[in-house]
Amino acid sequence: QPTVAEAAASLRSELLDLRARAYADADLASADPQMAAATVVERTALRAAALDLNLRAATALVAASGGGAMMLSSNAQRRAREALFLLVQGQTADLRQASLGYLTD
């Protein structure tokens, strides 16, 4: 079983990888306008991956916090609600489909 520190390190590593990939795609799209259209699918996949990571990180925080995470004053509870809000706020049909792919894999 991972410790809280190990879980946090794993999630952070995944975050840094997603961030690097997102910046690389943005740089590619800004350098070549034709590539901007070509990277739409990749950017949608990255957004879905980021939403999935956010949800898993919030869930890990709730799990690490224990029963107190359900209190309205809890930071973990607030993060969990925010993660769920971001999962549905402003999603396109393509992003919703990609997000469902992450949730069902």
Residue ranges of model-derived segments:
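Extended amphipathic alpha-helical segments enriched in small hydrophobics
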Residues: 1-34
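Functionally constrained cores in energy, signaling, and assembly domains
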Residues: 22-25, 43, 54, 64-65, ...
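Short amphipathic alpha-helical coiled-coil/interface segments
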Residues: 8-15, 43-58, 80
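Charged/polar positions within long, soluble alpha-helices
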Residues: 16, 20-23, 27, 55-63, ...
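Extended aliphatic helical segments
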Residues: 4, 40-41, 62, 69, ...
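Catalytic-core signal marking the mid-to-C-terminal active-site face
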Residues: 27-49, 58-60, 64, 76
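Glycine-rich phosphate/cofactor-binding loops in nucleotide/flavin-utilizing enzymes
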Residues: 68-105
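Generic serine detector
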Residues: 10-13, 30, 65, 73-74, ...
